[in-house]
């Protein structure tokens, strides 16, 4: 466990179910603290990440992990496409004798697996290196894989999201709306976020959005090598929520 336990300081849980050992290290971010794996109706679920629309998926969900099992039981593996977030998901469906592994669209969370004679699935590459001596595979972005639990054969491969690359936009209105939605849905449920703010465009756009929607945040800037005129202008807008940290030349 030493290769992976630091990924989840809030809880360590080990469960043996249907002759499979499940070990999960929890970093609690969203909703109530839910100890994984979640096992319901002979289906075991472990995931790493955040589901932003979990209340829309399942209004009674105590935490985002509950929405995964809910949508899977309702719609099957294709239902995972309804999830909006940053995650990797592992489902053991003992009713259908299947293992489902899913990444989000952009593979924001790591996941490595080996499904030969033994089943090894890990969010840390180093754990697979030790256990399987490099005979492992990383899941790809935008990928849902379905394996036979007994034969380990790949039964089905789906894309998480079908992109339409035909250009239909004539202005930036929809982009701005999508950007603001992306920022706001990532705002923490219970905590005030710290936002590192440079004089550049990326962090500046995030700060502008949070300020526009009155989302309380602590903005921290390190002036070294930054455009001070820009930072001072941002300080005027953000006021006491914007702090400077001065570092020495060392």
Where are the model-predicted features located?
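Cysteine-centered catalytic environments shared across enzyme families
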Residues: 1-250
